[in-house]
Amino acid sequence: MKLVLQRVKEASVSIDGKIAGAINQGLLLLVGVGPDDNAEDLAYAVRKIVNMRIFSDADGKMNQSIQDIKGSILSVSQFTLYADTKKGNRPAFTGAAKPDLASQLYDSFNEQLAEFVPVERGVFGADMQVSLINDGPVTIILDTKCH
């Protein structure tokens, strides 16, 4: 899995002008699923995300997790994280998982996250508009195959 984590003051995702999900303080996750991803990748990503200390404590030090601050997650599927830009000017997305597998793993990922923190989400495969107010900004790239 490839994920982009953005610390946000607020974020929302809309489809056809209607809000599908919205959060206040927490994390916006852009989630890409690869063809070799499995339950171990999901567990690793969930564990890292819910425990990562990227929120400020009273002293302004990044020392608190999303659980500590009682934050929420907005999860948005994002197959374009697997873009291959080596040849030409048009990216190829053949490195992303096929939609059936990606949808199943994305759903499972969100269900596992929801065991720890509230999770709002977009609609898998939909054309979505994402709005956010970055906090920091703090943006982290997480690749479950690089640990």
Swiss-Prot record:
UniProt keyword annotations, A-Z: Cytoplasm, Hydrolase, RNA-binding, tRNA-binding
Single biological process term from Gene Ontology: D-amino acid catabolic process
GO molecular function: D-tyrosyl-tRNA(Tyr) deacylase activity; Gly-tRNA(Ala) deacylase activity; Ser(Gly)-tRNA(Ala) hydrolase activity; tRNA binding
UniProt keyword RNA-binding, yes or no: yes
Catalysed conversion reaction: glycyl-tRNA(Ala) + H2O = tRNA(Ala) + glycine + H(+); a D-aminoacyl-tRNA + H2O = a tRNA + a D-alpha-amino acid + H(+)
Record Pfam families: Tyr_Deacylase
Subcellular location, principal: cytoplasm
Chain segments annotated as coiled-coil in the UniProt record: none
GO cellular component: cytoplasm
UniProt xrefs under PANTHER family: D-AMINOACYL-TRNA DEACYLASE 1, D-TYROSYL-TRNA TYR DEACYLASE
Assigned protein family: Belongs to the DTD family.
Protein purpose: An aminoacyl-tRNA editing enzyme that deacylates mischarged D-aminoacyl-tRNAs. Also deacylates mischarged glycyl-tRNA(Ala), protecting cells against glycine mischarging by AlaRS. Acts via tRNA-based rather than protein-based catalysis; rejects L-amino acids rather than detecting D-amino acids in the active site. By recycling D-aminoacyl-tRNA to D-amino acids and free tRNA molecules, this enzyme counteracts the toxicity associated with the formation of D-aminoacyl-tRNA entities in vivo and helps enforce protein L-homochirality.
Protein name in UniProt: D-aminoacyl-tRNA deacylase
